[in-house]
Amino acid sequence: ALVSLEDELAALHGKERALTFTSGYVANEASLSALVAQLPDVLILSDEMNHASIISGIKLSRAEKAIFRHNDVANLEELLAAQPNDRPKIIVFESVYSMDGDTSPIAEIAALARRYSALTYLDEVHAVGMYGAEGGGIAQMRGLEDGIDIIQGTLGKAFGASGGYIAA
C-alpha cells in the first residue's frame, strides 16, 4: 500500500518517484539534509520567507547557504551569478507562503535554475490538494512541474490525512 501511495504521489506531480515521511516538516528536514550529503560543496539558496521546517533542514545539512529577498528574482540571480557555474546549487522556495499567502514566481525561478545549472526544491504544502487540475499544486496549475526537480508536499492539509512526501 505504501509503494502504491508513493507511485500515486509521483504521478500527481509528473515525477519518477516519491518518498513518504511522517509529516511535511520531517520531509523538509530529512530531504534537505540528506540531499546535501550527496552534493559536496553545494550552496543552498533559500527564500527569506521559507518555513521553519526548511530552515531547520538547511541548518541540519551544515551546507553553505545564501538567503535571497522574498520572491526577488533579481536578487536571486545576483547570488547565482556570483557562483561558479559548475558548483552544485539548490534553490529552495515555496509555492504559497504560509505567513502571507503570496505565491512565488515559479517560472522565473525555474528559468534561473536552468541558466545557472541549479536544482530546484519547491515546497507545495500549502497548495497540494487545492490548486491544479489534479490537486498537484501551483506548479501543476501553471504547467511548470517539468521545470522543478523536487516537489515537497503534505497529506496533512487539503488531503485530510497525515504524512509528508517529496517527489522527484
Sequence positions of predicted segments:
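Conserved N-terminal alpha-helix of the aminotransferase class I/II PLP-enzyme fold
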Residues: 1-23
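Catalytic P-loop NTPase motifs of RecA-like helicase/translocase cores
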Residues: 52, 99, 122, 128-129
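Short, structured coil segments at secondary-structure junctions
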Residues: 60-62, 116, 147
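Active-site nucleophile and cofactor-binding loops and adjacent substrate-binding regions
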Residues: 19-25, 48, 152-155
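Active-site PLP attachment segment
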Residues: 134, 140-168
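Conserved PLP-anchoring active-site segment centered on the Schiff-base-forming lysine
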Residues: 33-52
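Active-site phosphate-binding strand-loop segment of PLP-dependent enzymes
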Residues: 66, 70-122
